[in-house]
Amino acid sequence: MNSLFSDISNFEYRNEYCNKYLLNDAETSEYIMSHEFEKDIEFICLGKQIIEAPILKLSNKVGGRYRKIYHFNVQNLSLLKIIAHALNERYDYIFSDNLYSYRKNFSVKKVCKRIGNTKGIDDMYCYKVDASSYDQHISGDILKTIISSTIDDKNVVKFLFQILDFKKYIYEGREYNDGPAVMTGNPLTPFFDNLYLIDYDDEMRKKAKIYYRYSDDIIMYGTLPQMQECASYTKEVFNKKGLIFNETKTNIYKPKETVRYLSLELSGSKIDFSKQYINNIRRLVKRKTHSFLKIKRQYGLSDELTMKCALKFIESNYGFFIKLFPIVNTTNGIAKIDRIIQDAIRTVGTSKFSNGRYRIKYGQLKKLGYKTLVSEYYSFKWAKHE
């Protein structure tokens, strides 16, 4: 088998990559197809350090803390992306089918469908695991051991070791040398995330009746003794690998008890949008409502015209929700989103956030062409079964 870096250096491979992923990014395509890129690959194979210190930026607060994201320069980012792509293509076979994060042909939709269709799921206990700041706690030394035993390309192993040992970053103009082995923002990080618990995946497949992992979001089902054994084993693994539980998101649940997993709520075989997801939609719609009210005042638009514009905008984004229809199998969450949208249109029409907005009745919304997401959901389901 050719070296992975030999494949990346190949003109046809790079050309196919650019045509598939970089059609609207001429600058990156030019670099990937250039002689400079070929020289960078040569330097990597010679063990030279060509990755420059990324810039650390803090994102918005999440749970009272800032999230650290490392931003690499454009050329380094482009180089790391194509290497990550090649790694995922070549070494996807080493991962269990129960792992579905950052992998081609694996999705939340597939997992939820499997869970919802599992015979006896309503009688099973569930153990859900979440790691706190997963990337930040991955041990470079432990990951190196895993890489050595799973990757058969010496140049790739050498390069990945170099990445894990590279701790430099820049924050507020000053250079530091105490960064984590795995940096959020590095295109290789998803591969590292998947690889770090690869042995855990293999073991949990044997211990639980149902087991799935998305990076550090883990869910499994079985009998109560099975889940207790899985919880005990997970604690051992986390202690050994230096990982920390997110205690608020790690628990054993009774049969049919609601479990929040990613953006969903699972209650046995029932799958719905989570409260957090619906609240995120509420915040987004509220911001957009303020934008439409501002435009209405600025241009002196009529109530009806403003509502029509808002409706047109909302319905143009229905495709986002329709993509999620195959995942959920109840309309409770969809109905809540419908009410959020209806209230937003009423607010846009009346310029009132109070109960005064309800002078616009549902019949008026229908006359303007409003269609509920619930009706779109059932149309989708019926079309699927025709």
Walk through the language-model features, giving the residues of each.
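Reverse-transcriptase-like RNA-dependent polymerase core
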Residues: 42-64, 158-172
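Conserved pre-motif C helix in the palm subdomain of viral-like polymerases
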Residues: 65-95, 178-205
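Glycine-/proline-rich flexible loop or hinge segments
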Residues: 18-29, 59-70, 94-97
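Active-site-proximal segment of RNA-dependent polymerases
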Residues: 79-129, 133-139
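Right-hand nucleic-acid polymerase module
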Residues: 77, 81, 173, 177-178, ...
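Non-catalytic, polymerase-adjacent accessory regions of viral genome-replication enzymes
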Residues: 1-42, 352, 358, 366-386
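Conserved polymerase palm-domain catalytic core
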Residues: 113-215, 219-237, 253, 323
